[in-house]
């Protein structure tokens, strides 16, 4: 971690322009108080951690974000033809974000290809009905205290080019990688319970520890009620998806469960399934680490499939539970994804498919008598291209069936099945074309439309898997023999 902020070339240009604009505004003002311009929040945090960041927020006193952004244009246009050259292509689109109160209007302006938000220093107050605050003009102190965590309360003063640690602990907490709120965590989470999920996402992203006072507040029943009341299901799903898209999804899930946050994001955990989460996390980490060696041809998962796989891990304690919806059976993980997280149908369908077929793959690896070209080919044909992600979640499912299940033994069993699939060239079974269509079967075999035709077509597919080089004539002869 750095002790000071080192600006890159573009940031130097931005800061220089902000300084000159501030001087330009002050030169026309009769006020004796100085205009304070600071870069705030996530950009300061990321720069101190040695990370690149293009998320620039500028905080201002005395003027609104809109006024300052407009003053940048005014300043640049006041320059002579030689002085304006460096800024000729620097100014981009200005977007005004209106507020009911004119003195709170904010703006977004593109400078040197960076989208920068300009906002006035503010104070916030909350009621018990909404996480959206009432905003009033504030000071740098109130602006720091309104933020979610101390690591996000640091400011970079553009005049002094120094870090300002208003809470007196933001820098230390960033240095020691501890996540704590600038005010009482109970008060903070009652005001805006979404901060809990943001905190878990930050902690997993930066590998921070969560302060015990924060964990205690998360587990307060009043916070649980506030969360259910104030946070929309769509926002919960959005945060969960961001966590699982990150580089440390395992830590995110560990924190969701160790802090008991899962109770108001997912559901009440069945006591007899508590052992599954640590086992599933262990198995999934091992799976990704050994993928290149164990299942090399299954490495090309899409981002959605990877997120869906981690989502499956998050919801594995409910993977054997079902509910009937409009006379159709759905697995509880799919219902949680659909109704509690409001996630896309891509994830919902993948979860339901995985939960449906995991026990079938588990039986295939544990009962060698069922491992044949016909049964496996038909299964892959039924799953189509998604058989790969179902296969991988089945590895995790089998690892978590019992507390005593061995991860290494399970991997070995699935490696044997994987090798069988590719040795027998079954991986693309869903592309196999039937030798005969329905009309041809009825004509050549003499069956009638309906259940008898479906059964005959299923028998034909099974025969094709057993006889990949078989002819139409051989197939017809086989199907006719079944009628005798």
From Swiss-Prot:
Gene3D superfamilies: Beta Polymerase, domain 2, cca-adding enzyme, domain 2. One of its GO terms (molecular function) is ATP binding. tRNA nucleotidyltransferase involved in the synthesis of the tRNA CCA terminus. In contrast to what is usually observed in eukaryotes for which one enzyme synthesizes the whole tRNA CCA terminus, in S.pombe, cca1 specifically adds two cytidine residues to a tRNA substrate lacking this sequence while cca2 specifically adds the terminal adenosine residue thereby completing the CCA sequence. It comes from the Eukaryota. The gene is cca2. Its main location: cytoplasm. A motif (B/A element) lies at residues 122-124. Residues 125-142 are annotated as: Flexible loop. Its EC number is 2.7.7.-. The lineage of its organism: Eukaryota, Fungi, Dikarya, Ascomycota, Taphrinomycotina. This is tRNA nucleotidyltransferase cca2. It holds the Pfam family PolyA_pol_RNAbd. GO terms for biological process: mitochondrial tRNA 3'-end processing; tRNA 3'-terminal CCA addition. It is an enzyme of class 2 (transferase). Keywords: ATP-binding, Cytoplasm, Nucleotide-binding, Nucleotidyltransferase, RNA-binding, Transferase, tRNA-binding. It comes from Schizosaccharomyces pombe (strain 972 / ATCC 24843).
């Amino acid at each position: 971690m750095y002790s000071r902020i080192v600006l890159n070339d573009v940031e130097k240009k931005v800061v220089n322009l902000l300084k000159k604009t501030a001087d330009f505004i002050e030169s026309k003002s009769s006020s004796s108080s100085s205009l304070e311009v600071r870069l705030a929040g996530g950009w300061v945090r990321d720069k101190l951690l040695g990370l690149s960041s293009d998320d620039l927020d500028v905080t201002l006193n005395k003027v609104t974000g809109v006024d300052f952004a407009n003053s940048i244009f005014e300043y640049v246009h006041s320059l002579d033809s030689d002085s304006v050259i460096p800024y000729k292509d620097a100014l981009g689109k200005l977007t005004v974000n209106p507020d009911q109160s004119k003195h709170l209007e904010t703006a977004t302006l593109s400078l040197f290809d960076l989208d920068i938000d300009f906002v006035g220093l503010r104070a916030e107050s909350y009621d018990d009905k909404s996480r959206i605050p009432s905003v009033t003009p504030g000071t740098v102190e109130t602006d720091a205290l309104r933020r979610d965590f101390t690591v996000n309360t640091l400011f970079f003063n553009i005049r002094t080019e120094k870090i300002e640690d208003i809470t007196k602990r933001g820098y230390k907490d960033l240095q020691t990688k501890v996540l704590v709120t600038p005010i009482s965590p109970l008060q903070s989470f009652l005001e805006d319970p979404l901060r809990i999920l943001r905190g878990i996402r930050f902690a997993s992203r930066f590998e921070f520890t969560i302060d015990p006072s924060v964990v205690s507040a998360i587990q307060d029943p009043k916070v649980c009620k506030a969360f259910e009341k104030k946070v929309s299901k769509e926002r919960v799903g959005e945060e969960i998806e961001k966590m699982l898209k990150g580089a440390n999804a395992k830590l995110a899930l560990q924190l969701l469960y160790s802090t008991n946050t899962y109770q108001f994001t997912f559901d009440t955990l069945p006591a007899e399934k508590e052992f599954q989460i640590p086992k599933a996390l262990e198995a999934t980490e091992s799976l990704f680490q050994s993928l290149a060696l164990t299942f090399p041809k299954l490495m090309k998962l899409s981002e959605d499939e990877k997120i869906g796989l981690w989502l499956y891990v998050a919801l594995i304690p409910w993977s054997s539970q079902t509910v009937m919806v409009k006379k159709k059976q759905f697995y509880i993980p799919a219902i949680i994804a659909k109704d509690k997280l409001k996630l896309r149908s891509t994830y919902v369908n993948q979860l339901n498919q995985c939960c449906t077929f995991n026990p079938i793959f588990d039986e295939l690896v544990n009962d060698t008598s069922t491992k044949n070209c016909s049964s496996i080919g038909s299964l892959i044909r039924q799953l189509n291209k998604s058989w790969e992600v179902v296969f991988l979640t089945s590895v995790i499912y089998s690892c978590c069936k019992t507390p005593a299940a061995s991860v290494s033994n399970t991997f070995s069993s699935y490696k044997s099945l994987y090798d069988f699939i590719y040795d027998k060239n079954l991986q693309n079974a869903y592309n196999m074309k039937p030798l005969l269509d329905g009309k041809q079967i009825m004509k050549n075999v003499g069956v009638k439309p309906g259940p008898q035709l479906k059964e005959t077509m299923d028998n034909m597919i099974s025969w094709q898997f057993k006889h990949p080089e078989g002819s139409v004539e051989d197939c017809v002869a086989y199907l006719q023999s079944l009628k005798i």
